[in-house]
Amino acid sequence: MRSSRMQSPGTMAVDNFLFGQCILYFLAFLFGFIAVVPLSENSDDFQGKCLLFTEGMWQNENMTMGKQRFIVEEWGPESSCRFITFVGIVSLILSAVQAWRTFFFLCKGHDDSLFHAFLNLLLCLLVVFVVFVAGTISSVGFSAWCDAVTENGAMPSSCEDLQDTDLELGVDNNSFYDQFAIAQFGLWSAWLCWLGLTVLAFLKVYHNHRQQELLDSLVQEKELLLGHPLQRSSYNRNAMI
């Protein structure tokens, strides 16, 4: 009774892989949600305009009063904001589906085949690359916006302080810094989760490949053991004849 309840080392290794993947998928889902929500809010606040890579400068609106106003020379490409939002949504959906699938396998004691484990590795590699690109666009593009509104640090106010100032751009800019700070945190944290999932997927492919090689070697040994008695019996019959 006690021996039947004990798990083999191979089964425990598979359960550890599945448990680690399930945790990372859940975290990737959580961080994807953290990234998508502020990006959607910023899109509504800026009325579809993208502040990433936006070019502009401060100009004197009234020479006598010395009042300055920030003038946008060219808004950033909308495709940049749409891309990082799309990547966040895709990461959110994929991680949710994979988390449910991995949790189901963990509860039922199932495991992926070598082919499905390899497909999962390719999927993780693709998502890692795409999320990395989205995080880079978000970080570099937002840095370009902050350089524009602060004139590369020449302004007395920081980029974070300027979100409390009405830039008179016809948009609601009172939370842009917090929104993109949270979005960048979500994207880069999700990237770290997918990077960890890629490592686990690679280890799982390697583990399944080693198991497949072990099974093949056992089958060959069995065929050899079954083949020797047959050869010996045929040899004895020929000797008797």
Feature map (PLM): residue ranges:
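Intrinsically disordered terminal tails
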Residues: 1-69, 104-114, 154-241
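Membrane-helix exit/interface motif
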Residues: 65-79, 94-108, 134-137
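A broadly tuned preference for mixed-charge, low-complexity surface segments
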Residues: 82-85, 143-144, 237-241
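Functional transmembrane-helix hotspots
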Residues: 137-155
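Physicochemical signature of membrane-embedded alpha-helices that form the seven-helix bundle of GPCRs
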Residues: 17-30, 77-97, 116-133, 149, ...
